[in-house]
Amino acid sequence: MSDAAEPQPTASFRSDREFREVMDRTFTLMSDDPEMGPRLRDADTPQRFEFTDVDMVVNIRSGEPGGPNLAWEWSDEIDWEPKVKMTMSSDTANRYFQGKENVAIAIARRRIKAGGDVKAALAIMPITKPLFAHYRAMIASDYPHLEV
């Protein structure tokens, strides 16, 4: 039996509000990080993430000059076009940010649906690798029920 049939470990957010709070903190961690933030700004890869189980959409892009490295809107009412579109559950996002979900495998197994310039998204993945440790520390400290 292949591991495609094996259930993924899950840890659920207590509410939609908690999910958004954790994701806002996660994007802030990326934006404020002295290594990740400038590299993500320079990569200039606008992305749209849809989280199906919490019925939320966030669009992320490089920040304006002189401002934060990243900007995001919890809406599709934006004045930029995403290069990459990803659809996943909040549980998949939580596993990914803990370093427990490989995006390429998740796409192949349909846990993540990807559209647009997927190569651009995969190209910035190495930039965000340091986030995993920061995210795990935040989860362990403030949201231990989300550890997987």
Model-derived regions, located:
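Feature captures hydrophobic
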Residues: 2-148
